């Protein structure tokens, strides 16, 4: 005899299934609403204006001569622009026959952007804003009510210089390239790099703080951007057993070497109009003959030396311990930006030279007269000033309700 399910039991089972389905539908609706109106969305970076923090579409070729890996950016790439790319030059050694393959074009980084207006951002936060050309990503530099100014690459707020916290400086590894004639390395705080624009390639300066370049590289080209003022470079102390360093600091220059007793020895000379080297040339050890010396105990074999040109000072650290610190001369006295380019001198072809230098650096933003921001106005800058269209160009004011939070500096979806 077949059993019969009572009607109330059947109804309860149907009710449970119905409630479960309704709950699933509600959860799906809430999930859709969240992802449609509240959850961050993924956006691609389309330009080089935030390099090296965020990269747009680019190639990353390796120079067959010196082995340097570098970036070739494509701003707002089009098939015609990509097809026109054939060869580029290495920014380190100058080798000019490096091919570009359209199939090897890398996509731009992706970021997660909030859908709602950002809470009041802090200085140096990365934010996104919709513009005529699409979504742009920049860095907050000026806050409402402040007076902002750019002097020789440095941001001034209400008349005082402002630098990023060192924890937010970019970090790069730079390859070294030995120059046979003469036997020395000239390390500057800028590097030209190629950007594809219009019909072909144009030269542009990418503000890395130091890199190797021929001693004949001009230091004051008419259209050259401002130099980077804040950077630090770290290398093993034993590096100084075979080489010596020269640092320019505005109207003065320093020679850094290791004594036979393995003490750090600094010699300083003043760069008067008569003694200052011509543009594009470098000082040599003979320029420091008879200069006053300063010495410091230095763990030459096991330690690391850090040279820092930051916060308007030139400083030397040994494993984090400050050895020397010298304030930069006022700009009004020197008539030139204080950039601290680094020159490495050696007479031995077998001298130990690190294959790479670890560099941390801030960014120079050029020059702009003082500007007072409104009560709800923000001042935005790109990390690659030479390729960034930002608040320096004026135009519409940037308001808080236009900004969106970039919740991750780089997020792959």
Predicted regions span which residues?
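Extended hydrophobic leader/signal-anchor segments used for secretion and membrane insertion
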Residues: 2-413
């Amino acid at each position: 005899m077949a059993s019969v399910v009572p009607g109330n039991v059947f109804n309860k089972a149907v009710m449970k299934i119905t409630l479960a389905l309704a709950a699933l539908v509600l959860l799906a609706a809430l999930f859709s609403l969240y992802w449609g109106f509240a959850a961050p969305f993924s956006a691609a970076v389309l330009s080089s204006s935030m390099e090296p923090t965020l990269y747009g579409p680019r190639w990353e070729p390796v120079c067959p001569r010196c082995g340097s890996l570098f970036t070739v950016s494509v701003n707002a790439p089009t098939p015609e622009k990509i097809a026109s790319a054939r060869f580029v030059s290495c920014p380190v050694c100058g080798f000019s026959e490096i091919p570009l393959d359209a199939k090897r074009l890398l996509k731009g980084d992706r970021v997660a952007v909030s859908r709602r207006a950002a809470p009041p951002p802090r200085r140096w936060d990365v934010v996104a804003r919709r513009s005529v050309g699409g979504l742009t990503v920049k860095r907050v530099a000026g806050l409402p009510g402040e007076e902002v100014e750019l002097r020789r690459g440095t941001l001034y707020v209400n008349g005082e210089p402002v630098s990023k916290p060192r924890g937010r400086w970019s970090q790069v590894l730079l390859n070294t390239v030995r120059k046979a004639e003469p036997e020395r390395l000239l390390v500057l705080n800028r590097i030209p790099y190629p950007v594809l624009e219009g019909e072909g390639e144009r030269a542009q300066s990418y503000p890395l703080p130091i890199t190797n370049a021929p001693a004949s590289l001009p230091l004051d080209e008419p259209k050259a951007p401002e130099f980077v003022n804040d950077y630090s470079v770290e290398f093993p102390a034993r590096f100084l057993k075979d080489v010596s360093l020269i640092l320019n600091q505005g109207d003065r220059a320093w020679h850094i070497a290791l004594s036979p007793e393995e003490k750090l020895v600094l010699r300083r000379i003043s760069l008067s109009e008569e003694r200052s080297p011509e543009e594009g040339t470098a000082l040599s050890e003979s320029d420091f003959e008879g200069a006053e010396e300063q010495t410091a105990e230095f763990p030459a074999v096991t330690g690391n030396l850090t040279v820092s040109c930051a916060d308007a000072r030139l400083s030397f650290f040994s494993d984090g311990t400050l050895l020397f610190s010298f304030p930069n001369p006022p700009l009004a006295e020197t008539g030139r930006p204080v950039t601290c380019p680094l020159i490495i001198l050696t007479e031995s072809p077998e001298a130990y030279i690190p294959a790479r230098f670890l560099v941390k650096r801030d960014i120079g933003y050029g020059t702009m007269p003082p500007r007072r921001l409104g009560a709800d106005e923000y001042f935005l800058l790109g990390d690659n000033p030479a390729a960034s269209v930002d608040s320096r160009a004026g135009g519409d004011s940037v308001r808080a309700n236009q900004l969106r939070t970039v919740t991750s500096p780089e997020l792959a979806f």
